């Protein structure tokens, strides 16, 4: 927020249970843009679920395409003839794989997954290469009953590429059909969260990211979920 070329992300996902496959299928589309750079990911997934102890475990894989590009038409190089800066749009795409495992009970959940498992290298149309590093994700959460209609939901999210890491520590209060909370992203900022269950099928949420160390500035996120 607040300056031209600020980072923006759009994410669309859908999933459905398929009983005869003993699991479910999903579709995920993510589009990112930062300045003149843009990424587009399209993933289809399948997860197998089975009973394990007092909960269920799911194991799945995703398969899709990752596209990245750079629009050099709006760059103003310090010197003419800089071959490192394209004069127009360059892009490329590559097959992409992911996998994960997820366990949940009535009160808790724990999940681990990996993206860009094969570390694909996207070759742009000008011959330059855009490598994708393998990423690892860990999530965990628990729900406490404070009263008959008030729940406390602490959770954590860890993302790492093996060299750098990002960790979020979250706390949400859920009251009937409303929720609100705060998330702390280590060494980066605070995220304020709020949401409303409009009816049994439709949910709306919003988040405001207040950055402490990042020069990119604050950001705003809107989430809309519909269950068919």
Which residue stretches match the model-derived regions?
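Subset of outer-membrane beta-barrel
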Residues: 1-228
